[in-house]
Amino acid sequence: MKILWIVNMVFPKIAKKLGAETSASGGWLLDLADGISADPNVELTVMTYYDGEFKDIKVDNIRYILFPGGGNRLLFDSNKTAEDCKKALELCQPDLVHIHGTEYAPGYEMLKVCGDVPVLLTIQGL
């Protein structure tokens, strides 16, 4: 099963590899990603934004699709964000999209463009 995650942070493993900044929050996401990616029947792809050029790389059995723009893109430019979401869908061809929060533009834009792909939306901290 191919799963595409939409997250609002750069995971530490990929940040270290790219020399990028990461957040101290979201530890539960990291543990969940490690557990899911250990299943040989699952291909996990994580989409997010960071302050660098477009990257499509794999680290420790997790594929990362990183779009340029960092924090600004999390909040603004919905047309470009929708294009990025479409590109991630084309690259990953997921069986399921899992959006971790809708407080930023990527989660909302993915909901609008994902078509017939089933979506799981997780909201935490209520």
Set out the residue ranges of the language-model regions.
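N-terminal subdomain of nucleotide-sugar transferases
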Residues: 1-52, 62, 117
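Histidine-centered beta-alpha loop that forms part of the nucleotide-sugar donor binding/catalytic region
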Residues: 8, 69, 123-126
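Short glycine-rich, flexible loops that bind phosphorylated cofactors or substrates
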Residues: 12-13, 72, 105-106
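A conditional alpha-helix N-cap/helix-loop micro-motif detector
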Residues: 25-26, 78-79, 100
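Short loop/helix-cap segments at secondary-structure boundaries that form the rim of catalytic
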Residues: 53-59, 110-113
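A short, charged, and often flexible helix/loop element on the N-terminal side
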Residues: 60-83
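Short N-terminal targeting/anchoring amphipathic segment
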Residues: 88-104, 110
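Charged, glycine-enriched surface loops/patches
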Residues: 113-126
